[in-house]
Amino acid sequence: MPISSKLNQRVRARLREEDFEHFSDESVSNESLDERESNEDTEQDNRDQRETDDDDTEDDGHTEISDINPSLNTISFGALAKAQAALGKRKRRTTSTTDITPKRTKVLSRQSPTPSTSSNKEHDQGQGLSEFQKHLASNAKKPPQKLTHRTSKHAPTIQSSRHAVSRKRTIIEPLAAPKPRDPRFDSVVLSHSTNGNPSTAANADIHARNNYAFLNHYRTDEIAELRKQVSALQTKKKKTERDDHEIVRLKREITSMSDRQRAFERKEMEREVLVQHRRREKELIREGKKSQPYFLKKGEVKKEVIAKRFTEMSGKEKQRALERRRKKVVGKERKEMPWGRRGVE
C-alpha cells in the first residue's frame, strides 16, 4: 500500500471506557424506545381491527333480525303454541334428569371451558359433573356412629373420646365403709388359734371346720323344725292366703338349707377320698412299691365320691337314684335325636 494512501486515512481519537459505557447505554435506551413504539402501533392496529369486526357483526345481526321479522309475521299462532309446548317439555325433562343445584351449576360453569359442539367436550363435561357430585357426597357430614356394645362382660366399657371430663374433684375422700367379718374363717384369728405353727396354719380351714362342727347339727335340727311347721300349716282346716304364702316361703327355705347341707357333705366326702388316697400313696412309697405318688384328677375324685355314696345308700334310695339317672340319660339322648323321632320311643 503506498504511503500517500496511508497518510490520507482519517484517524479518530480513541474513546475512554466511561464514554464507551455512556454510548452503549444510550444505544440500548434508544432500541427499547423503538420497540415500545412499535408495540404500541401494533396494539392500535389490533384495536381498530376489532372495532371493525364488531361493527360488521352488529350489521350482520341487524340484517338477520330484519330478515326474521317478516317470516315471524307469517307464522300462525297454532304453530307457535305447538313449538312452545315442545320446548316446555324438553326443558322439564332436562330439569328432572339433572339433580344439580344452581350453585353447583355456577361453579361448574366457571370451572368448565368455553362451550363447544364436539362430543368429546360434552363427555368431559359429564365426567366433571359426576366427579363433582362424588366429591360433594364424600364431603357431606356422616351421621354419628353409635357406640357398640362390649364383646363380653369382662371387656372394658366403651366410651367416646369426646366425652368431657367431670369438673368435680374429690377433695376429701370418704371413709371406708365397715365390712362384716366372720371370725370362723378369718386368717388372723385362725393363725392365732394355731399358735403360729406353719403346718397347722396351712390347714386352717380344716381346724375351723373341726372347731365349728356343732353347727351342722344345728342345721339338721332347723330343717326338721321347718318341716314340722309346713306339715302343721298343711293340715290346718281353715287356711288363709297368708298361710299359703308362708308354706311357699318355708318350702323354699327348706330346699336352700338342704342343698347347702348336701353340698357340704359332698365336699367332706371329696376331702375324705383325697385323704385316703394320699395315705395309700405314702404307704406304697414307704414300702418301695412306687417311686412317685399319683395325684387324682377332679373327675376321678367325683367318680369315687359317687361310688362311695352309692354303697352307703339303702335299697330304696338306690332305686330312686338309678331312676333319676336313667331319666337324665334318656333326656339327653332325646335332645340329640331328630325332631321327628323324639315322640317315638
From Swiss-Prot:
Associates with 90S and pre-40S pre-ribosomal particles. This is rRNA biogenesis protein RRP36. Transmembrane segments: none annotated. Residues 219-267 form a coiled coil. Residues 15-167, 312-345 are annotated as: Disordered. It is found in: Nucleus, Nucleolus. It holds the Pfam family RRP36. InterPro entries: RRP36. It comes from the Eukaryota. Keywords: Coiled coil, Nucleus, Ribonucleoprotein, Ribosome biogenesis, rRNA processing. Component of the 90S pre-ribosome involved in the maturation of rRNAs. Required for early cleavages of the pre-RNAs in the 40S ribosomal subunit maturation pathway.
